[in-house]
């Protein structure tokens, strides 16, 4: 689909579900992303009282470079398994590659989930796109009109160049709040991806690459990253292989004291983690293992794998951000009373052994379930 054709479709959708819609709102959009809200009514209040409406559900949609041949990818900012199931059902509906049909299916399913009647506006999604200058173009600002004229000259640009287009509807740039050196890394990745695409040597999937680029941008602008709690380095510039260094843990924990000693002895003042992502991310979790130092406790298994339900298919949600996963691992190591094993054989941590330990523990927990350790255990 051409840039102008995609833009026309997005404007059509935004004209139906505008920012004041009573049920579903397209808050902002770009050529490769939608930011939407589903408004949930409050439950019936007790007699003589009133309840404030709950916050709206926030949904994101990534539009891939091959749209409409491949379906857009949706995820939701919520841990609610019911909402995750809605998106999984949408993903399983292979015939819904059209953004309009996806929206119709999604809104109807969310209405069923919250026992709401089907909204009449969803029927408008079956209508053909307006032609000419009628309907959706009335609310376009002069800035948007200029962008539209520019778009006509760049219809043949590939996906990665499209992502660099200036945002509309007053939305802040996706790169705002990111330091220059990190912007340079993002730009290098975009250029590499573009060249690989032109050479027919694309690695990974469009879905995973788009989401990982978003996750990396979110990491670079996060306060925890800027405060030096952790750092991220891409191994061989690959979006699918990250080194994450945990520089700061709870200062009252024994692990913090151990890291101070480790710095004095070996010049290492961090815990090095490896995050490995597959083509089906974010629908499957990353594989995470400790690379160094060797730890005891902290739910760290043989080979450096981590015993966390969050990192299994059973406990994972496509809504989870990598930033939150990193911070959860940081907290779990402290909660599990992890300690540095000084003098331990460093070769005992490797990928093959970590995968073996991970697979074994997952099989055990699939049979017996997961549990939360009692407070006296940390």
Curated annotation (Swiss-Prot):
Domain of life: Eukaryota
GO biological process, one term: protein K48-linked ubiquitination
Active-site residues annotated for this sequence: 307
Keywords for this protein: ATP-binding, Cytoplasm, Nucleotide-binding, Transferase, Ubl conjugation, Ubl conjugation pathway
GO molecular function, one term: ubiquitin-protein transferase activity
SUPFAM superfamilies: UBC-like
Compartments reported by the entry: Cytoplasm
E.C. no: 2.3.2.23
Changes after translation: Auto-ubiquitinated in vitro.
Pathway(s) the chain acts in: Protein modification; protein ubiquitination
Primary location: cytoplasm
Role, per record: Accepts ubiquitin from the E1 complex and catalyzes its covalent attachment to other proteins. In vitro catalyzes 'Lys-48'-linked polyubiquitination.
Protein name: Ubiquitin-conjugating enzyme E2 Q2
Organism whose genome encodes this protein: Mus musculus (Mouse)
Taxonomic lineage of the native organism: Eukaryota, Metazoa, Chordata, Craniata, Vertebrata
